[in-house]
Amino acid sequence: MNNLPVVRSPWRIVILLLGFTFLYAPMLMLVIYSFNSSKLVTVWAGWSTRWYGELLRDDAMMSAVGLSLTIAACAATAAAILGTIAAVVLVRFGRFRGSNGFAFMITAPLVMPDVITGLSLLLLFVALAHAIGWPADRGMLTIWLAHVTFCTAYVAVVISSRLRELDRSIEEAAMDLGATPLKVFFVITLPMIMPAIISGWLLAFTLSLDDLVIASFVSGPGATTLPMLVFSSVRMGVNPEINALATLILGAVGIVGFIAWYLMARAEKQRIRDIQRARRG
């Protein structure tokens, strides 16, 4: 097989730098202006941490942050559990009656517009409230259910791709030695797909934290998430507190992302060492 020649051109570096600049320059400007002492977000008036203090004293903003983080963590956890079960059914159970319909229902939220999803869930909750009296009020619970609905699809796709790459001979060898399918899953399969589960959890957490459209449909008067509060604030003018909040979120995402990358890299190295040790043994 002939390998195609690698074209080394300085333009590749230029294009790469332009791409990174386009992606990260706005974030850098946001971080810089979060330390601006002026009330006008576009006018520089000197360095100050004033808006971080104002942010911490803003009860409405802190309440929205707490609500969004709680919903995102709970939705990501539920989506990780349901997505793992769905992925195992899709990959390990093979063809069964209704498998195509099951796969379609799992992946449908990936291509469904948020407006349609939000409106359909709103109609569902209203119909349930009239039929059985639940939910009596729309709020944190309805937002959580809505987020689990679409986050599960993303988690299932991530874990399914990982399951298809696994060497099934390891699982078959364990069952030949007398292990039950349930024990094989928890002792062998689950540790091997754990990096994918963590990735799916982080993806679901990000999607839930970032959602505005669906939450706007299914939320109630007493439940205002962070994207909803930020959107309403921006419509009346950009508040410098938003720059400070965005900077804190960027820092938190960077730290969590690094920790997740480190844990997954260490788990992957350990998995490779275990496989090599088993083959030598």
Swiss-Prot record:
Pfam families in UniProt: BPD_transp_1
Periplasmic side of membrane: 34-68, 136-140, 207-243
Regulation: Transport is feedback inhibited by intracellular polyamines.
InterPro entries per the UniProt record, alphabetical: Bact_Polyamine_Transport (IPR051789), MetI-like (IPR000515), MetI-like_sf (IPR035906)
Predominant place of localization: membrane
Transmembrane segments: 14-33, 69-88, 116-135, 141-160, 187-206, 244-263
Subcellular location: Cell inner membrane
Annotated keywords: Cell inner membrane, Cell membrane, Membrane, Transmembrane, Transmembrane helix, Transport
GO cellular component: ATP-binding cassette (ABC) transporter complex; ATP-binding cassette (ABC) transporter complex, substrate-binding subunit-containing; membrane; plasma membrane
Subunit structure: The complex is composed of two ATP-binding proteins (PotG), two transmembrane proteins (PotH and PotI) and a solute-binding protein (PotF).
Record PANTHER family: PUTRESCINE TRANSPORT SYSTEM PERMEASE PROTEIN POTI (PTHR43848:SF2)
Protein name per its UniProtKB record: Putrescine transport system permease protein PotI
Organism encoding this protein: Escherichia coli (strain K12)
Organism taxonomic ancestry: Bacteria, Pseudomonadati, Pseudomonadota, Gammaproteobacteria, Enterobacterales
Name of encoding gene: potI
